[in-house]
């Protein structure tokens, strides 16, 4: 028989931990650039009976019966993703951005081929060729980086390395780069050397959808993204491509690297895409950028150095070396004060990845809560106070109290506490 007890009775320990996490999110300042708060509608879709259904294959071509409803769900997600980004084809089945990237590589290259990608040390992602990741183990990775003069991507170096190494794939994208990515310039380099252009827009997908960042879809053979972060959907992946690549790309997801798709998550993706197609989403993205610029100015006024001097998107990197702090110390001190950030490598970082010399800060989650430039000035001041006295328990406690007061003005998930 089916267990019918609600979660609080069926598993009080998990129920309590969920309440604790919800309270942590509601009472703290979430500044991790890759995190956001999904809508109740997205969560409702993820918790639906769609989680029960196996559906190997694609709409209309399944290996299981009973897929007539999930076919409609998945097709809605596909159609909405295509409309949102102006793409010819969309695959909504990737369980994550990493799996989306894996499928993109396998669709365009074979193990041992050369891939030109942004170095993790300069803001790239693990799946862009880190030696500890599948991408670095299966492919010959040639990394590119930044100019020391302004800490922006060295496009001359990208062109030089492309001509020298003739990569099969030119991967563009970053997990910690605060400036605009000029996809047209990358596309020109890729064409010159006969490389396929792949763009990982995981961090900036929401900005792209709102027209606040250049769209890579017209320039790239394949575009990958997560569906959370600025897109504000469930945790998952998405691939966009041209119709000419659709068949081979689909086969790399299933049966290549995945089995059954998560139709409850795909439904949540569809809901998020629907939300992103509304005019209010464009205004939300505009506010993300406005808040990021206000936060950046506030951090500079607090005496903090920002990599590249500021931001064009939703995130910024703070160099803590002038404060004689590591990223690890900064993250821990801010965490005690109720401000969540992540330690992050900065360009030419002398520290190890688990220590780092910087922190990464972003505004998507606080913008979802309704905070604006005025609150960003306050947040910047709070961050500055903590980083000026990271070991002072009185300062930490005082800031923690102010954080709670600020968060109380922008309540969230109250029915779940």
Swiss-Prot record:
(6S)-5,6,7,8-tetrahydrofolate binds at residues 120, 124-126. The record marks 228 as: Plays an important role in substrate specificity. Keywords: Amino-acid biosynthesis, Cytoplasm, One-carbon metabolism, Pyridoxal phosphate, Transferase. It catalyses: (6R)-5,10-methylene-5,6,7,8-tetrahydrofolate + glycine + H2O = (6S)-5,6,7,8-tetrahydrofolate + L-serine. One of its GO terms (cellular component) is cytosol. It is found in: Cytoplasm. Its main location: cytoplasm. The modification N6-(pyridoxal phosphate)lysine is found at residue 229. Pathway: One-carbon metabolism; tetrahydrofolate interconversion; Amino-acid biosynthesis; glycine biosynthesis; glycine from L-serine: step 1/1. Its cofactor is pyridoxal 5'-phosphate. Its EC number is 2.1.2.1. Transmembrane segments: none annotated. One of its GO terms (biological process) is glycine biosynthetic process from serine. It is an enzyme of class 2 (transferase). Belongs to the SHMT family. Homodimer. Catalyzes the reversible interconversion of serine and glycine with tetrahydrofolate (THF) serving as the one-carbon carrier. This reaction serves as the major source of one-carbon groups required for the biosynthesis of purines, thymidylate, methionine, and other important biomolecules. Also exhibits THF-independent aldolase activity toward beta-hydroxyamino acids, producing glycine and aldehydes, via a retro-aldol mechanism. This is Serine hydroxymethyltransferase. It comes from Anaeromyxobacter sp. (strain Fw109-5).
